[in-house]
Amino acid sequence: MPFFKIEQKRLPFNHICRMKFYSYATNNTLSPNSSHVLKHSTSTDMVYIKQLYNTSCSRYKCYPIFDEYQSIYIHSSKPGVYESLIIMENGIRKGVLTYVVNDMMNYKYRVMEIVLLLYEGTDYTDLFKQINKHCRAKKIDAILCLNIGENNKFIKKFNFVPGFDTYLYMYNYHINGTLRPSDILFNFI
C-alpha cells in the first residue's frame, strides 16, 4: 500500500500515526569505546539483513514488505546520498543502520536522516556514540530521526531536540484509532 507523510499540519482526514521529528547536532564529541564498528554493507551482508529485518518485523504493526530487489536497493549504499551500515559489536554483526543524506542550504549543512535502525544488542549508548563519530567523519552536521522503532532508545538519553510533528497516511485507507510511533518500524521517506 502506498504511504505518504505530511509534515507539521495534518490533513482533514484520519492519519495512521502522528510522529515527531527529533534532531541532534553532531558537533558534540562523544567518545565511543571500541566495541562497536560501523561498516558499509556488502552483498555478503544481505542474507543477514533480510533475516534480521524479517525477525524484527513481528514486533511492529506497520512496516514495509520488501521483495528481494527492493531489499538490496534499500540496504546498499551510494556514498553521500544514502548508506546502509552494518553494526559490528566485538566483531559480530549485530544490526543495520540505513540513512539518507540531505544537503541543506547549498551544501553548507548536511543532515543524516535515519530510515531504519535494527539492533540486536543492548548498548544503545555506545552505538549512538559510534553513529555520532561516523557523522563527524562524514562531515554530517545533524542527525534527524522520527520517534519510531528503536530510535527512542537514544532520543531521550542524548537529549535530541524535538522538532515538528509529521503524520503518516495511506491512500484510500481508513482505520479507527491510530498507531503509536513505537508501532512503526520504517521511516517512509
Task: Give short role names for the model-derived ranges.
Residues Y63-V81:
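Active-site rim helix/loop that mediates acceptor-substrate recognition in acyltransferases
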